[in-house]
Amino acid sequence: IRMMRIPTPYGAWKKDKDDSSIMAKGDPGDADGDFYDIYVEGNFEAFDGDENLKEKKEDWSLDFNRNYPYGWFPENRQAGAGKYPLSNPETKAMADWIIEHPNIGGVSTNHTSGGIILYPPGTRPSTAVSEKDINQFIEIANMGKEELGYEPLNIYDSFIADPANYDSGAFDDWCYQSQGIVAYTVELWDLAKRVGVPLVWNARNKESAQDELKRFVACMKWVKENAPEYYEDWKPFHHETFGDIEIGGFNFKFSQQNPPESFLNGVLEQMTRFMIRFAQSMPRLTIDTLTSEKVSDDIYKVTAIVG
């Protein structure tokens, strides 16, 4: 899946003056030159040639990380939440399994992309929960930083954009705030950091369009040099709705969202080392001493010190 650029005098995008393969936002008031609309490659519904342009709806539009009970909000606040908490059989099965296994001490839900290690809470500031818990979250996450190079971030303090209207119902929040389990969401693959223009993850501090373009250009250059099979130059294409357009750009799924295939094993090896260290940090049941004393025939007193 690539991008489509469609010529239109009403478009918000222009070809970059230094590199025509790059699309940049036009300046307000700029009316000179060629303009384009940019969409993900695909078809559209209810298009009458002028208005009512609507991309095809996803078949299910479910987001499992909005369907867990803790902090759940309905669809009118967050898309993908489902009809009610645990309405999806997959999330219900996960919750049931965890509840049935009280020996679980830690979980990690592994996402793409971004190159960060997120930890709860995501529904309130980190200062509102146990300081001991937060210190433990940071201490274990720093193991991940050593292995992966990813920064640990609290979800509420440093990741969400709107503290008054945040999305919730996430797996990690439910694990921690409902079940008392140490839980992380690891966003694997850090292309922006690799190209030297890392993302600013405090989402409340919006970066400029110039910084976004700088990172995009650097990412495109990196992909062309290191994974050229995941980039295509713009090529003419006849679209059934828009006529003559162009299709090209990144294969987003395997360049920015996930590592290119040749980089996948390296990321997985780093993540595996973190997960092993995470598991080794959990409490382990041991029997320190075990003694027996004969009380009478066929009766013994057994003493065990469990630590």
Predicted ranges, named:
Residues I1-V295, Y300-G307:
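Metallocarboxypeptidase
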